[in-house]
Amino acid sequence: MNKFLILLMVFVASLVFALPEDAKQPIEIEAQSVVVDETTGFSEFSGNAVVRQGSLLLSAELIQVQTDNEEVVSMIAKGSLEKPAKYIQSQENQARFVEATASQITYDVDKGMVFLVGTARLVQGFDSFSGDTLDYDINNDRVVVKGNKYGTERVKFKIAL
């Protein structure tokens, strides 16, 4: 178990995040329980799981981490409507944070993308975006928000001037 967590810290430390310093920081994962399958590279942290690396914070009731060839491929944080998953991180060259919440947050390492599904909300400085789904491109600081397919939940955007 400890061997896996140390290896996981090394793998995740190589990820590209909004702050270059974050990628050099060790990763810390806390949860009430963990299931690790070293043959598939899959691990599941449950019970108020929290991932920290530098300024990055990812928290949810359940966080799944997938590795391939000793590199992290993705992290999926699963919350609920009552207690959504949360993503927080500082932005490079800015004194503000990006804070996102949703029922499910998926971080795709290769693409540098954060995908939010289910009552998605992202706050960036004084601006906020919300909708059913939200895709956040970390590297290009680009946000795509969509309402639900039934048209009952529209996209909302608030900008502070």
Feature-to-residue mapping (PLM):
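Mature-chain termini and adjacent capping regions
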Residues: 1-161
